[in-house]
Amino acid sequence: MSDSPKHITVLLHEAVDGLAIKPNGIYVDGTFGRGGHSRLILSKLGEQGRLIAIDRDPRAIAEANTITDPRFQIVHSAFSSIPDICDELNLVGKIDGILLDLGVSSPQLDEAERGFSFMRDGPLDMRMDTTKGLSAMEWLAQVSVDDLAWVLKEFGEERFAKRIAQAVVSYNKSATEKISRTLQLAQIIADVVPFKDKHKHPATRSFQAIRIYINSELDELEKALNSALTVLAPEGRLSIISFHSLEDRMVKQFMRKQSKGETVPKGLPILESELNKNIPLKTVGKAIMPSEAEIEANPRSRSAVLRVAEKR
């Protein structure tokens, strides 16, 4: 991200510190965004160091193309393709660290035409990669009440999922023109949510759920997590920032599962060193949240959680 106050990289130093940068190491920034983490990683690398950055947002790719550092390369893709990219570059098992900054970026929220924000009027798009797949508008125009309610409940933990789904589908069936604008959808949702939270817009959970579904965000994360063990070198680090409970739960459970050995009955003559042979990861420290100062400077960082693990 740029140095604009609107585009402040969340947990910048903490996430990069989590990688324990080796000057001549090879690193992957799976979510380039506007380049805040990537630029800091490059500043810590020596002449033989290398950074591969990935993003599926064409605007992020345009920003990355302004970096002329020979140690840096950008790939237009989703971060679930990290194993394929590393395979093509003959880097499987050689990566010293992977950084993922999950969710939607500030520039994406701030640009009304991207359709991510219920606070700005724009076309109802919500795609991270605007060159691929159905937009939110196209999907909502064809979805059933049951399917929409499932998405809102599963990915937004929305308690009024059925009521909202009925309102959205009913509107699209009866109106001469389908729902096509962000504020239009936000108002339809607000009109049917019976209880208002003064600290949260009634459309917050629904917009999150639709965005996650449109971009297959949790599937992407699962693929990236499962491939990390193959891609990372021994002592390679995984540094992941999540912004909502669904993402953080996945990251936490993955790291916990991969850092615990099999349960062995007490009394068996097995050395602890033998048990640890089959444990692929170890967690590094505790989860890190933004400081009060960072939250004050950048309120969007409030829900961020950083978790770090190291391959054994």
From Swiss-Prot:
* Signal peptide annotation: none
Q: Which reaction does it catalyse?
A: cytidine(1402) in 16S rRNA + S-adenosyl-L-methionine = N(4)-methylcytidine(1402) in 16S rRNA + S-adenosyl-L-homocysteine + H(+)
Give GO terms: molecular function aspect only. rRNA (cytosine-N4-)-methyltransferase activity
> Could you tell me which NCBIfam families the record lists for this protein?
16S rRNA (cytosine(1402)-N(4))-methyltransferase RsmH
Major place of residence: cytoplasm
Q: What is the lineage of its organism?
A: Bacteria, Pseudomonadati, Pseudomonadota, Gammaproteobacteria, Pasteurellales
EC numbers: 2.1.1.199
Per UniProt, the keywords (alphabetical) are: Cytoplasm, Methyltransferase, rRNA processing, S-adenosyl-L-methionine, Transferase
UniProt enzyme class: transferase
Q: Where does S-adenosyl-L-methionine bind?
A: G35, G36, H37, D55, F79, D101, Q108
Gene Ontology BP, a term = rRNA base methylation
Q: Which GO terms describe its cellular component?
A: cytoplasm
Give a short account of what the protein does.
Specifically methylates the N4 position of cytidine in position 1402 (C1402) of 16S rRNA.
Name listed for the protein in its UniProt record = Ribosomal RNA small subunit methyltransferase H
Give the top-rank taxon of the lineage listed in the UniProt record for this protein. Answer: Bacteria
SUPFAM superfamilies, sorted: Putative methyltransferase TM0872, insert domain (SSF81799), S-adenosyl-L-methionine-dependent methyltransferases (SSF53335)
The record's annotation in Gene3D superfamilies points to:
Putative methyltransferase TM0872, insert domain, Vaccinia Virus protein VP39
Q: State the family named in the UniProt similarity comment for this chain.
A: Belongs to the methyltransferase superfamily. RsmH family.
- Protein's cellular compartments: Cytoplasm
